[in-house]
Structure formats: structure tokens, C-alpha cells
């Protein structure tokens, strides 16, 4: 699914996932994200990495107005919703099983005049990538999508397909396991990777990646 399963040791930490709504303020809008831990599990709750990435977008470090963006493994859709509110044209993606829930959050939180800027589409990493034009997006977003090692090759293939030489990838994650570093090492073979933000309170890192370009004069 979309977001990473991990063990919250504090009982209070788990309680927030069982609330039917998670409320946030971004881009001068109140956003109410519907959650459904009981029925849909980890893909249907808002994890810290999504909040940190949405906050980073709101900082204005990345120019969103008019840009073409895609969110991978969107889950509840928070990051894509915020990107649309900040002016991006966003394709918000997840696996087919998650789409109905994802659409409900997107439709509930975008004003009518902004809704045309946000499209929800099915995307399973590594499959049917021909539905998307190569290098179609300026910005690729992912929050807590690095978690299952068996998906790393498909995720990397998907990033390579969606990126042009000028695209920017922003991945927000909490480093929990050695395999998380393994993915970053895989990513660095095809992309230049740098850490651009760290939220110490939530222990979430944001990594920026851009496709490595071969020098034409070599």
C-alpha cells in the first residue's frame, strides 16, 4: 500500500490513528483528512512524513505554482492536496485498492476551482508505466514510501520513467532500518541525492534527488 508500517511504542501515538479525522492547516486552508485504520490499515492514516513533506512544500523552497507534480503511494492524499492548494497541477497516485478512499479525501479538501488541478490515478510501481509519458513531471513526491525491500527495484524503475533530466524528486522518510539506507544507495546510482531538510521533533528526513546527466563532451 502507500505508507510504511512501523511499531509505535507509545499508546498515545497509536490513538491518533484511530481518530476518524485528522485536521491540519496548510496554505490558508483547514484540511480534514478522513482516516480508517480499522478497515484499511496503514494506508489510511496520516503519518509524520506526510506532514513534514507538506510543511516543507509550504515553506516555498520549491516553486509549485504551475508545475506538474505527481505523488507516489499517496495514501490519504495529504501531500498532493497541499501541493494543489499551493498551485501545482498534481497527479495523486496509489494502487487500485486505495483509490476510492484517496479520491474521497481529495474531493473533500479541494475547493471547486482547484479540483481540476488534482487528478487521482492508479499507479502500481513498475507496472503499466506506459500510461504516463516518460519524463512527464517536474516534481515527484513521496512520503514514507521506502519500506518494503521487494518494492525497491519497481520504485526506482518508476522514478526513472517519470523523471526528466530537470525533474526533482522529494522523498520524506523516517530511517528505521538498514534497508532504508539500501534504497538510498540504489537511488544514488541513477540520481544525485542530498538531504535538504530534517525535522528533529518527528525524526523525518527529506531527500532531494535529480537524474544524473551524462556529459555530452565526454
Swiss-Prot record:
Gene Ontology cellular-component terms for this entry are:
cytosol; protein-containing complex
Annotated localization: Cytoplasm
What processes in GO biological process is this protein linked to? protein methylation
Q: Could you tell me the keywords of this UniProt record?
A: Cytoplasm, Methyltransferase, S-adenosyl-L-methionine, Transferase
Q: Binding of S-adenosyl-L-methionine: at which residues? A: 47, 73-75, 94, 125, 143
The record, for Pfam families, names: Methyltransf_16
Its Enzyme Commission number(s) read 2.1.1.-
> Is S-adenosyl-L-methionine a UniProt keyword of this protein?
yes
One GO molecular function term of this record is: protein-lysine N-methyltransferase activity
Reaction(s) catalysed by this chain's protein: L-lysyl-[protein] + 3 S-adenosyl-L-methionine = N(6),N(6),N(6)-trimethyl-L-lysyl-[protein] + 3 S-adenosyl-L-homocysteine + 3 H(+)
User: How is this protein named in the record?
Assistant: Protein N-lysine methyltransferase METTL21A
